[in-house]
Structures are given as structure tokens and as C-alpha cells.
Curated annotation (Swiss-Prot):
One of its GO terms (molecular function) is N-acylglucosamine-6-phosphate 2-epimerase activity. The lineage of its organism: Bacteria, Bacillati, Bacillota, Bacilli, Lactobacillales. Belongs to the NanE family. One of its GO terms (cellular component) is cytosol. Pathway: Amino-sugar metabolism; N-acetylneuraminate degradation; D-fructose 6-phosphate from N-acetylneuraminate: step 3/5. This is Putative N-acetylmannosamine-6-phosphate 2-epimerase 2.
Amino acid sequence: MPQISKEALIEQIKDGIIVSCQALPHEPLYTEAGGVIPLLVKAAEQGGAVGIRANSVRDIKEIKEVTKLPIIGIIKRDYPPQEPFITATMKEVDELAELDIEVIALDCTKRERYDGLEIQEFIRQVKEKYPNQLLMADTSIFEEGLAAVEAGIDFVGTTLSGYTSYSPKVDGPDFELIKKLCDAGVDVIAEGKIHTPEQAKQILEYGVRGIVVGGAITRPKEITERFVASLK
């Protein structure tokens, strides 16, 4: 795995934009053959991105062929009836750990998990198995972020705010959560519903370690829908 320290990664992504480049099977940019996501990555890098967030072993392997930017990797896999689906079990962690990526992100919400573990126990198991791997917690509320840090997580993402039944539903970033975590001394990677450059700039002022933007850059269907809706 990349022997990059947390400090070195923080320096690399400081004051920049990490671009999430993903397409799920039901989305227009998804193809069985692959090849589309690396093009998005190349465009993001040429535009000045400092990192990439990506989903699936296939996409990450293809991405690594076109860029040296640091990668936050996830595997989205459903485990019904449980809700967590972002790197939800050790199986996904194992698959990602083989890819030599800088950061592995995992669902760190308090929701019931497929493996039956409390999230802090799962984090401890991952840290024990992969002690040199940097980890990012995808969370939805303040308490989840603190619990993840306590268990040894490196970065806390606000990725899932608005996507759990108990977190605020707003059409935009959860500024309050991001600021509260930063004020508590947490190493935050802000993510989720960051639609505009102005929002990203405001978030940067809170003292986050990194900012992930996805849909507003790499989901043309979603971007088109926003323009269309604004005219109605």
C-alpha cells in the first residue's frame, strides 16, 4: 500500500478539491465495458483536482492507470435489509486494501450493520488488520464523527448527512455539522451536496482537511436537472 503518512496526505489535498468520479449501474455514464470513469478523472486532474474519490475495484484499477493523484476508495454493495452500503463489511475493505490506495472510506453511521458489529468494533478490526491504511469515516451526524475518531479513524467525512433517517434534510451542504466537527478538532473531509464553488469556499474557511465534490462536477444528468428545475 502507498506509504503515505496522514500528514503528507493532508499537505497534498490542502486547500483543494477532491473530485468524486462514480457511475452506478442505473446511471447514464455507467458502462459494462468500463473506460468512462478514467476520462472523468483525467478531466478533473486537468482542471486542478488534488484527489479522486472512486467506487469499485474495476474503476479504481482503471483510474490508477491514468493518474497519480491520491485516491479515496469505496465499494458500494447492498446488504439488505440493512441500510449501510458503502464499504459495509470487511470483505469490501479487503478488496480495497489490495489496490494500494491512499484512503479507504467506510460507512460509520450508527445504523444496524450486516455483520452485526458496532461501528467502533468494526473500525478497530480494520485498524488491526491494516494498521498502515488511512481510513475515512462516512458519517451523518456529529456523534458518529466523534465515535469514529475515538475508534481510531483518520478522517471524518460528512458524506451521509441527509441520507440517514435521523440527519437533517437540506438541499446543500450540512454547514453546521462541518463547522462543529472542525471546531471539535476533528480532521474533516467535507462531502455531500456541495453544489457551488461558493459553498466550497465557505467550507474551506471552517478549517477542513479536504473537500469532496461529486455530482456538481461529474454527474451531467444531475447538473442538467438543476438547470431545468431553476427555470420552472
